[in-house]
Amino acid sequence: MAFHDRTDELQALEERWRSPRAEYVVLYGRRRVGKTELILRFAEHKRCVYYEATPGTESDQLEDLSRALAEASGRELLAAQPLTSWRAFFAAVGEELRRGPLLVALDEFQFVARETPAVGSLINRFWREHRGDPNLFLILSGSDVSFFEREIVGYTATTYGRRTGSLHLQPFPFPELSGFLPGWSAEDAIRAYAVFGGVPYYLDALDPAATLAENVERHVLAPDGLLRQEPRFLFAQHSDLREESVYFSILRAIAAGRTRRNEIASRVGRSDSATGQLLDKLMEMGLVRRVHPVTVANPDRTKLVRFAIDDPFLRFWFAFVHPYESRLHRRADAQEHLQGLVMPSLEHFVSRPVFEQVCQSWLRDHLGAASVGWWWGSVKERVDGSLRNVQRELDVVAIDHEGIVMAAGSCRWTAGRMAHGEKTLLNRLAHHLTPDGPEPDLYLFSRSGFDARLTREADGDPKCHLVGVGELF
């Protein structure tokens, strides 16, 4: 995989390399997000022991590690006579530190820890002995997010408090797609983001000269597609998981629109409490997130909770691939599925939540808001001459660090222009959020522009802002 712009992260590592102290950095993030490429770019022109662990016995891992140490140190004997223990490896690294600055990067460290549980204690001991040596730069890296947050960076981890820095590498945000899809329109880039998300490995697979439909067929739907089995590879990284089929059933339910815990439990045939535990595990893995109205004062106690798949590609796969795998055996099947189901459903699939999330991210950056998200709840409205409680939702709400609503927005991914009535409804709901406070600004986002009346009113209202898709990219 090619190295893509990780300027901030690379700069942070380089600044630590120049610091007058030992460094111990934890770098983790989901599979395919670019951790290895970042480490290798950082390691350029540095004396480095880089080791990418794989599942295997301790002796196999030490043999591979000895080869990496031999390449970095010039001690060819290590390759012929591998080290026999991790204690011996850390002793050898200690000797190498006497020769000058040394970067030691242990990638996919979760495989080492599972095979040799005592390695964490050995690292702690090594760090205690050498934390005063400015020649040492140690990186632990890996793809098992739940393992790293539990065993490496969490409060209960044996290594907690010893690291000097940590980086949780995330997928690229939507605006970064311009580097992967040169020449694509903002509309098509949003569609691509809805399918492939911001994971560099997935985006690298795309052919910018081909259409989105061609890329989806070739890489996701075809039997030999590069990403056809990607979710299964993703789950294979987590050896502590049991009942993969149940987790897949949960993700499939969420992708189909069942976002409340009781709806998910009913779909997978588990109790609410058992489903809650499974959802907790998926959240630990960074695959699912808990969503609540952005204005909720105490998110941990609210009952207004929904669950969302956090990765657009996983959402697409569980919506359009997993339920139909039994009929996708040939390339001709993939073409038929693409034209018969995927493309006719794509605009609806893009509209929510992906287009709304793109608008939320833009507004967060534009306003410097503390938090931006959805809002939903009960609103009193006059229906048939009487006041009734009506359930309403807002696509975008931004709040500041005081919890005050700064802005409210509406998003429309449709072929027609956004009508003036959208502003009227948005204004009424925004007033409901701030009945006694200052009126928030209104932001209206539209794929296809705005009608003449709405445009005219917005021109004369400094608190009303119209945003087209071209401004988002």
Per-region residue spans from a language model:
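A cross-kingdom feature that marks ATP-driven nucleic-acid transaction machinery
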Residues: 301-473
